[in-house]
């Protein structure tokens, strides 16, 4: 009987150990599962952060790419601006020669030649986006540079009286403002 009792005790001891082992295993499994969940959550957070960083960097890259394309386009569009600036004194000389021709010389071959040359030059310039600045009545500091003020009975204060030097634009951008005199009546 004692053997039987020992056997039962041994058996119950084994069951208890087995149960403890299984509980420990289940506990370890649960602990491992919790750690796996934490690791997975950390991974997902880091993945989200990295993905957001990637999207921002990609957007920045696209913006830089667009800006470079725009800058390149502007550089190509205004590449001839320096040449246009260098041509302006030639135009001024032609205009001066034309203006200095006296009334009798207006019909001379030289005057007609100057007029044709100026006309052709203006056509070429217009074809390449270079145009003269209009100097009508109103003074506009964006397009005109007031060199002097003169008394004028015919013009109101601040109105353009005389164009001293023609101004030019290249594709809408001012190459050189027109030099003008404006009316100043006290």
Swiss-Prot record:
Any GO molecular function: protein-folding chaperone binding
PANTHER family to which the protein is assigned, alphabetical: GRPE PROTEIN, GRPE PROTEIN HOMOLOG, MITOCHONDRIAL
What segment(s) does the record annotate as region Disordered? 1-32
The record's disulfide annotation reads: none
Q: Name one Pfam family in it.
A: GrpE
| Assembly description | Homodimer.
Say if the entry is tagged with keyword NAD: no
| Gene Ontology biological process terms from the UniProt entry | protein folding
Instruction: Tell me the domain of life.
Output: Bacteria
Q: Where in the cell is it found?
A: Cytoplasm
User: Any idea what this protein is called?
Assistant: Protein GrpE
Question: Is Cytoplasm included in the keywords of this UniProt record?
Answer: yes
Q: Name one GO cellular component term.
A: cytosol
InterPro entries recorded for this chain? GrpE (IPR000740), GrpE_coiled_coil (IPR013805), GrpE_head (IPR009012)
Q: Where is the composition biased (Basic and acidic residues)?
A: 1-17
Function according to Swiss-Prot or TrEMBL: Participates actively in the response to hyperosmotic and heat shock by preventing the aggregation of stress-denatured proteins, in association with DnaK and GrpE. It is the nucleotide exchange factor for DnaK and may function as a thermosensor. Unfolded proteins bind initially to DnaJ; upon interaction with the DnaJ-bound protein, DnaK hydrolyzes its bound ATP, resulting in the formation of a stable complex. GrpE releases ADP from DnaK; ATP binding to DnaK triggers the release of the substrate protein, thus completing the reaction cycle.
Q: Which UniProt keywords apply?
A: Chaperone, Cytoplasm, Stress response
Write out the similarity annotation.
Belongs to the GrpE family.
